[in-house]
Amino acid sequence: MFPTGDSAGREGTVNNMPAGFRLQFLQSRLKKRSVSTGSANRTPKFCQASGNPLLPPYLCGRKFLSMISRRNIRVKVMQTLYAQSSLDSATPLSNSVAHLQKHYEQTRQLLVFLLWTLTEIGRQVEKHALQKASKHLPTEADLQINTKLAGNEILWEIQQDTTLADHLKKDQGARHGMENLIKEIHAHLLESPTYQQYIAQPSRTRSEEKKMLLQILNDQMIEFEPYVEWVEDHFTNWEDDAEAILQLLTQYLQKPGKLSGQKEGVSFQQLIPADKWNFGKELLTTVIEKNEHLLSLIVPKLKNWDPERIASLDMILMKMGLAELLYFETIPPKVTLNEYIDLAKEYSTAQSGQFVNGILDNIHKELAEAGQLKKIEFRKS
């Protein structure tokens, strides 16, 4: 995460939370869409509704039309503008766009890392069995370690994805020093009743192979605190991108081996398609190029507030919201206002949502009355 501040300029980071709280915070965000089974204390491990029974509960009912939403893009633009605000104001526009591209690149790197973790857990199953069998005096149990997961056909297809292999060659930083953590995840997996049931079945079905990998993803990876801490330490975008990444990863496991974007496959372009990239770039460049005009509309509404003492994120969000109201004619004003109120509540201070809402709503009403908002009538498709 990036720093946040209040009106007095005090700043901190979400990563300063205790590790256990960070884990609970992330899980509450990811699982807020869990499917109800009619009982307050029963939550299915996978969706039972028609369409895709293999999805984890927090993804039930979601459509995989676009992995990254405009909200995700707004967050990345916000982060880019925040980073720029702490640098020389004369930062070239091209540098800001390149910085935004780095945020997109982090999203891709996170997806690659999660896929790599899955394959490494499979490899650890085989390594563990070989180590046991290679003991000087192996026991009968040492010689009969079940390696079914190592032969999981989905894992094999992932490892044969040449596009993924190319990305793995470029993204090696977060993987250094992971050996012990992979062993911990593997040890945790061995104690799982679901895993014991999986290896007890001598036969294989593609459905069960997929289901086992999704169980590992949910129960042994994103719910394992040491792993989440590792991801947080190496990927500052984890909390912002986790849900979208897990959507794409879940979809990829339905048709593995096609991250190159082949027909009916899953591509990295689906994660951040061209229209989302263009939206982010246009929003970023508009806020930078129209900065003085945006400030001329915002500052008079601050009344008793000193612009220098307003939380920097609040000012950034107000400029972004106003830029959307003025220059993005296909986005309904209500959508813009609601989005930036939510972002202010989540990323800035406790009072920021109300503050940003008051300023933007005031400006919106004046612009609408003056006929300065050029919006295309919004129609639901």
Role assignments for model-derived ranges:
Residues 13, 34, 50-60:
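Intrinsically disordered, low-complexity proline-rich regions
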Residues 6-12, 30:
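Compositionally biased, low-complexity intrinsically disordered regions
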Residues 25-28, 33, 46, 64:
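Cationic, low-complexity basic patches in intrinsically disordered or flexible, solvent-exposed regions
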